[in-house]
Amino acid sequence: MLVCDYIVEQIDGDYAHLRRVDLPDEELKLVARALLPAEIVEGCKLHSELMKYTII
C-alpha cells in the first residue's frame, strides 16, 4: 500500500499534475480531478492513501 504526500503543481482542465513531496525529482503524476477534493488549488498539499486524496 502506497501512502505519500503530493503538492499540486498545476491544474490543467480535468487533470492535476502532482509532485511527490519525498521524491521531488520524480516525474509528475497526472491525476483526474474527479478523484481529487473539489477544493484543490495549485500549491496545496494532498495526502494519498488507498487511492483516496485528502487536503493537508
Regions found by a protein language model. Name each.
Residues 1-12:
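Structural detector for short beta-strands of small beta-barrel domains
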